[in-house]
Amino acid sequence: MNTLSRREMLAALGAGALAATLPMRAFAQPGRMQSWPLGTSSRTGIHDVAPAPDGGVWFTAQRSGHLGYFDPRSGKTELIPLGKGSSPHGVIPGPDNAAWITDGGQQAIVRVSWPQREVRPYALPKGTPYANLNTCTLDGDGDVWFTGQSGVTGRVEVKSGKVSVNDAPRGRGPYGICTTPAGDVWYCSLAGSFIARIDRKSGESIVVAPPTPDQGARRVWSDSRGRIWVSEWNSGNLSMHDPKTGKWSAWKPPGTAPRTYAVYVDESDHPWISEWAANAMYRFDPGSEKFERFDFPREQVAIRQIHGRRGEIWLPESGTEHITVIRTA
């Protein structure tokens, strides 16, 4: 592992002196944040969101077993049944305009064509123990890679429909997963406290250990330079690993005991994080190393994942059954 600079080491350890040098900017200006209640007859268990190709937003309804579709133009919500026993966690947009979903209840990766709304499950191989499917991403070849918190990663070869599963290092924990602009696949382990690159030929994981022990890496996202940004649940840090140099950097959001859940990098290479202790969103500027805070008008919103499109940051409020957008343009 590369030697950390004094600044990087202090950041990784979450030193209070460093945190004090990273002040907040003003709260979000009126009009930049807009929220809607989902308006469904019962709780959906909204978990993850993803931009749909027609300007709407998909979300996983983990409690009710649906793919949700929210239309911000009308404010209406549609629920699409995914199958018996469904309990979807993650959703991403595919290059085929379809929604790709990790469905722990069905032990399957599910594709929903759009706008046809045709549902097709890709079941994990027979005999696979319960995987607790979490999140998925598409690699540079158009195949779907996924994580299972029970201790697996896997792939759906989209052209053939073949599904394969690999054991992850250190057992349970695989959670967030992402793809770099070069097409490489990285994931993180919440229980294992590491990130890893997947060898796309063998399916094996190459572990990269962070400098902060037991940091609880929950979500990962790549920026345009292929650097991996990590939300650390246990340490509260926002960290970044540069695969080209092997170096790590880390920053602590404002507050005494932050709980950083999700991370997303927008089109301007600004990382966004959801911070549960503050019930707030933060946008981080890597140049100035400052956090900008965005507050919610509701308590305990519980943002578990972040996604977006140009000029829009979309947020699923698991705690309140709302969906929110922060407009940046």
What are these model-predicted stretches?
Residues D71-G75, S113-R117, E157-G161, D199-G203, ...:
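Short loop/turn segments that connect beta-strands within beta-propeller blades
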Residues I303-A329:
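Blade-level signature of beta-propeller repeat domains, shared across WD40, Kelch, NHL, RCC1
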Residues Q34-L38, E78-P81, R120-P125, K162-D167, ...:
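A short beta-strand motif characteristic of beta-propeller blades
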